[in-house]
C-alpha cells in the first residue's frame, strides 16, 4: 500500500 503510517502494516515495496 502507498498510504502513510496510519494503515496497519502498510508495505511500500
From Swiss-Prot:
Catalytic function, reaction form: a beta-lactam + H2O = a substituted beta-amino acid
Keywords recorded for this protein, A-Z: Antibiotic resistance, Hydrolase, Membrane, Secreted
MF-aspect GO terms: beta-lactamase activity
Keyword hit for Transmembrane: no
Cellular compartments annotated: Secreted; Membrane
EC number from the UniProt entry: 3.5.2.6
Entry keyword annotation includes Transmembrane helix: no
Protein's GO biological process: response to antibiotic
Chief subcellular location: secreted
One term under GO cellular component: membrane
Family according to the record: Belongs to the class-A beta-lactamase family.
Other remarks on this protein: The class A beta-lactamase family has a specific amino-acid numbering system, sometimes called Ambler or ABL numbering and often misspelt as Amber. A multiple sequence alignment was used to derive a consensus sequence and then the consensus was numbered taking into account insertions and deletions. This allows use of identical numbers, e.g. for active site residues, despite differences in protein length. UniProt always uses natural numbering of residues, hence there appear to be differences in numbering between this entry and some papers.
UniProt name for this protein: Beta-lactamase
Species whose genome carries this gene: Streptomyces griseus
Amino acid at each position: 500500500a502507498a498510504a502513510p503510517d496510519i494503515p496497519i502494516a502498510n508495505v511500500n515495496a
